[in-house]
């Protein structure tokens, strides 16, 4: 029997992720969701989908948490931001290997900005809901503001005490 306590579910799902057994984790969390659709179980499912890089499906799950307006709303906003931010980081790393005059460089820069623009309101909402939980939004917004709006970057840098 699979445990139902959130603590155990979270630890088991972390194990599945570390071992590359995300599909097994999804199968288990779907069974739990069939009996009890809690914000925590939904959040875990969203994380598993995120780990599989099924970002649209993950966003749909996180939006369900937000629309239910219960627990983990700020965290769900942050994870939606992650669904745009981290794919952008892959492109940032790719661009670091390209010459600035490479046509692909500008194309990538535009993609990065587009993904950052999508991520930004979700991190800002997480900040609004949980201003003291900087792990949800702090460094992500700093990176985004650095790329998109230096004035916001300077202001946030001061706020974070850097």
Predicted segments with their positions:
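Generic helix N-cap/helix-start motif at coil->alpha-helix transitions
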Residues: 1-11, 35-44, 72-76, 133-137
